[in-house]
């Protein structure tokens, strides 16, 4: 039997105690071990015959295609998307430079290559005039007025702002429940500040689950990139620049506010 998540030795100690107390016999343990060894020995030949090489570039291209087909366009006011040639674009948001592309916890894997949206925008050949980047906010939610001021200053120089927001690895991970459905307060404050000086804001949202969107009226476009994998940023760039058309659909119902959800009356209670 495979036990997940890893028990950290608790189950081993329980088994040792059970053997000493006579509740479990060594023959019982041997029988379970034989089953595991049978699996190991019966699959060894197949593993040995498995291909030892693979095409990393082809895998990355497939990942980019899969991510692009999953991206959801939630809003596009005044046809602000796709971005247009000659348009002065400011990229703001920590997720543009350090992508949130996968879940946190035991699901995390080491990708051979990970796209960053900032690099993809800089390398784009659509004729967009990139005017600069600002992180805009602390990724883990701490207030940082200086970063926000830098972002607002940059937003004033652009025709359009691409604002990369989302849930960080500490707010959304295996082993914990989210305390709410909201974006971090510092991200919402940044959106307010940027929209106050430049109404042409495109929000690209990175998150593995729904977030409430009472702030959606303060951006002209809202694109849900989910957790797009190693090539998710490149796929997002393809969508934003019009190389590909967004065709993804939501797999969950999104509420504008937590008050709109049926769970509002129960969430946050004590016990079960």
Predicted regions and their residues:
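Mid-to-C-terminal alpha-helical segments outside catalytic/metal-binding sites
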Residues: 26-44
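Catalytic center-proximal scaffold of phosphoryl-transfer enzymes
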Residues: 5
């Amino acid at each position: 039997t495979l036990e997940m998540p890893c028990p950290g030795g608790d189950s081993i100690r329980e088994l040792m105690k059970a053997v000493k107390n006579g509740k479990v016999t060594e023959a019982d343990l041997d029988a379970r071990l034989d089953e595991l060894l049978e699996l190991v020995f019966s699959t060894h030949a197949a593993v040995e015959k498995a291909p030892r090489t693979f095409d990393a570039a082809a895998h990355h291209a497939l990942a980019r295609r899969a991510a692009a087909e999953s991206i959801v366009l939630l809003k596009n006011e005044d046809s602000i998307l796709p971005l247009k040639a000659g348009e002065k674009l400011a990229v703001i948001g920590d997720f543009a430079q350090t992508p949130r592309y996968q879940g946190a916890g035991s699901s995390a894997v080491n990708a051979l290559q990970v796209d960053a949206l900032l690099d993809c925008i800089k390398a784009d050949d659509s004729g967009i005039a990139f005017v600069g980047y600002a992180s805009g906010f602390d990724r883990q939610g701490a207030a940082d007025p200086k970063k926000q001021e830098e972002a607002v200053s940059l937003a004033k120089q652009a025709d359009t702002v691409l604002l990369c927001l989302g849930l960080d690895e500490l707010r959304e991970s295996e082993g914990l429940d989210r305390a709410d459905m909201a974006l971090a307060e510092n991200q919402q404050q940044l959106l307010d500040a940027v929209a106050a000086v430049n109404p042409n804001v495109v929000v690209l949202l990175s998150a593995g689950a729904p977030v409430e969107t009472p702030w959606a009226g303060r951006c002209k476009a809202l694109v849900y990139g989910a957790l797009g994998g190693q090539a998710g940023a490149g796929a997002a760039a393809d969508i934003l620049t019009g190389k590909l058309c967004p065709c993804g659909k939501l797999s969950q119902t999104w509420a504008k506010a937590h008050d709109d959800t049926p769970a509002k009356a129960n969430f946050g209670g004590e016990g079960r």
